[in-house]
């Protein structure tokens, strides 16, 4: 491992683990966007220590262009990387990849968390095998902050688990509560289970069982009950819990709806001279709205429930987006997210997962991205 130049602003020999291990080779435009993101993140986390893992021959000259990032980073050479289209089973066989080495750094206690813009399926597979799940968590989930009319909310699962049972949904509620406390600063976030209706009789057995368990748990005062799709954007609850299939569809439907809305607005304002003049009047407000819901601000989905912080950046992220993913990871590390989850699991008597029936013990479907 080689070290970036020592400056008065950073002590390379600082005790304790690195804050983050960063996969420098993951993503469509790595390593440039990774380094650009770290350069931006350096202003917000000037004392963070980063273990940058990737091809040293590429990273050393590239890092020289980003002096703020260089002050935070030590470089560790990785001879291989995982492509965006590689299947998880194949990725597991690639020894010495930058993503795998980042996971190994967390498992060994060298770093508190991982950030990568690489292959989602490979990332989850490696995280499960190397970082491993927290005791009491049967399935890690993907969680992220999303905008709503009432302010930011958190939602999970966004694609890590296609099918879930009642216990999984209760675990997601526990992890969602802890993440909302860490990311949004909410002492007692409200929780909703996504369903086809808000009435107690709606939905399937697993949803009703999960609802009953939550109402009988210490989370009961925060449990709102069932919420519907429109409640996500309305911000009815601070945490929205669902299975990975439904969550991923809801997320991407919302993203598509926003693109459609802006496309229609643009078309309307280009209709004639009068509408063009009207656009000039409302342009400042539209720009503020676009900035508020800018997907780059919300980049960074956390694989929550692992024995370490693992954050997935969008593969097509730019520097600003990647910096947002670093922010998510740093928030989780500095607010001791996993300690909050462990404490709540212990309070609920869920220190170990329920036994899995042989038929259910088969490998879960690959996550959707």
From Swiss-Prot:
One of its GO terms (biological process) is phospholipid biosynthetic process. One of its GO terms (cellular component) is cytoplasm. The keyword Transferase applies. It is an enzyme of class 2 (transferase). It catalyses: a fatty acyl-[ACP] + phosphate = an acyl phosphate + holo-[ACP]. GO terms for molecular function: phosphate:acyl-[acyl carrier protein] acyltransferase activity. Homodimer. Probably interacts with PlsY. NCBIfam families: plsX. Belongs to the PlsX family. This is Phosphate acyltransferase.
């Amino acid at each position: 491992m080689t070290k970036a130049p020592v400056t008065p602003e950073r002590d390379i020999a600082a005790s304790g683990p690195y804050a983050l291990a960063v996969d420098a080779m993951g993503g469509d435009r790595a390593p440039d966007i990774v380094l650009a993101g770290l350069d931006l993140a350096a202003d917000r986390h000037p004392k963070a220590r980063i273990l940058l893992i990737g091809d040293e021959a590429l990273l050393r000259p590239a890092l020289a262009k980003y002096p703020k990032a260089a002050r935070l980073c030590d470089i560790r050479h990785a001879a291989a990387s995982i492509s965006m289209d590689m299947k998880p089973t194949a990725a597991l066989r690639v020894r010495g990849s930058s993503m795998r080495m980042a996971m190994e750094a967390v498992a060994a206690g060298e770093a508190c968390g991982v950030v990568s813009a690489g292959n989602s399926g490979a990332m989850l597979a490696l995280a499960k095998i190397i970082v491993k799940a927290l005791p009491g968590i049967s399935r890690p989930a993907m969680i992220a902050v999303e905008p709503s009319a009432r302010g930011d909310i958190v939602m999970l699962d966004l694609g890590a688990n296609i099918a879930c049972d009642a216990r999984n949904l209760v675990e997601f509620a526990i992890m969602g509560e802890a993440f909302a406390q860490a990311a949004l600063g909410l002492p007692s976030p409200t929780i909703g289970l996504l369903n086809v209706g808000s009435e107690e009789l709606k939905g399937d057995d697993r949803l009703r069982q999960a609802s009953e368990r939550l109402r009988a748990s210490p989370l009961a005062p925060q449990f709102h009950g069932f919420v519907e799709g429109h409640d996500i954007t309305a911000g009815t609850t601070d945490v929205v819990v669902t299975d990975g299939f439904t969550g991923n569809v809801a997320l991407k439907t919302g993203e598509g709806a926003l693109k459609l809305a802006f496309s229609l607005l643009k078309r309307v304002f280009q209709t004639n001279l009068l509408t063009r003049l009207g656009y000039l009047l409302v342009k400042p407000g539209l720009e503020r709205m676009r900035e508020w819901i800018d997907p780059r601000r919300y980049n960074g989905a956390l694989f929550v429930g692992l024995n370490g912080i693992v954050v997935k950046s969008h593969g097509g992220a730019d520097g600003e987006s990647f910096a947002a993913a670093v922010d998510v990871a740093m928030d989780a590390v500095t607010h001791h997210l996993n300690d909050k989850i462990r404490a709540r699991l212990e309070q609920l008597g869920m220190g170990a997962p329920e036994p899995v029936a042989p038929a259910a013990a088969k490998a879960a479907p690959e996550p959707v991205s």
